[in-house]
Regions:
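Short, hydrophobic/aromatic alpha-helical segments in well-folded domains
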Residues: 42-45, 61, 126, 150
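Charge-enriched, short contiguous segments at helix-coil
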Residues: 33, 110-183, 203-217, 222
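Short, hydrophobic, well-ordered secondary-structure elements
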Residues: 46-47, 51-75
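Intrinsic low-complexity, glycine/proline- and repeat-rich
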Residues: 182-242
């Protein structure tokens, strides 16, 4: 690590036991950027706890965020699943602390894949081993590390802004991202991606403010027509190249 980078690290995490902190920091994945801003902030809190040596805090934090996420998804999308057989199991809940019910619901509603389900099941196991008394020795460091890897993976699978996200057209127009049309009616996408998205046409522009914020501007008129993603990409590329 370069000297200035090390200085920034120690400013953030402190100089006491900095070598051990640095080793822990290197050993875990960095928090992904989520379309839900609070997820990124909470993952950073979990990371800080782990790096500082607060292993139990980091592990329980990872488990709590996992529970928070399946509650957010179920409670905000359930009205779209009134006709689904699983709706009867969750429609009265103000919150859900039954992990099996939460995970089963996400799987039944096709919100999570088999791989994400496996991560959730394993995080549930870690939660039970952590929260409920175990009359045995527990090595919290590998448990906390695994918990962080699992919750980072869950957030990445569901909310990450990146090329692996099937909901997003990633840089088909260089440097730009768009929600794919085929997913616009998916309840999960409508609830969690739409609030972070802006409806634009292919002639929109992006302006930078003095405070380094970006403003999307689009006062253009467009034909009242429905176009495909491929056609939008073609029009946008042509417009951007002028």
């Amino acid at each position: 690590m370069k000297q200035e980078e090390r200085a920034r690290f120690e400013t953030r995490y402190g100089v006491h036991n900095s070598e051990a902190k640095f080793e822990r920091w290197l050993s875990i994945p960095k928090p992904p950027i989520s379309v839900v801003g609070e997820h990124t902030h909470l993952l950073e809190d979990i990371e800080r706890a782990y790096v500082a040596g607060g292993l139990y805090s980091a592990l329980t934090g990872a488990c709590c965020l996992g529970e928070r996420i399946f509650n957010q998804i179920i409670l905000r999308t359930r009205e779209s699943f009134k006709g689904h057989p699983h709706y009867k199991h969750v429609y009265r809940h103000g919150s859900i602390n039954d992990w099996d019910l939460g995970i089963d619901t996400l799987k039944q509603w096709e919100v999570i894949t088999d791989d994400t389900e496996k991560k959730y099941r394993r995080l549930h196991t870690l939660r039970n081993e952590t929260v409920h008394f175990q009359d045995k020795e527990q090595d919290l460091e590998p448990m906390a590390k695994e918990g962080i890897e699992l919750i980072n993976g869950i957030v990445t699978d569901l909310f990450c802004i990146g090329p692996e996200n099937k909901f997003i057209s990633w840089c088909e127009v260089p440097g730009e991202m768009y929600l794919r049309k085929e997913y616009e009616t998916v309840p999960f996408v409508k609830e969690f991606y739409f609030p972070s998205a802006i409806l634009v046409g292919y002639k929109h522009t992006i302006a930078n403010t003095p405070g380094l914020k970006m403003i999307v501007q689009d006062n253009n008129e467009y034909p009242d027509a429905d176009i495909s993603d491929a056609e939008f990409v073609r029009l946008r590329r042509e417009y951007a190249s002028k």
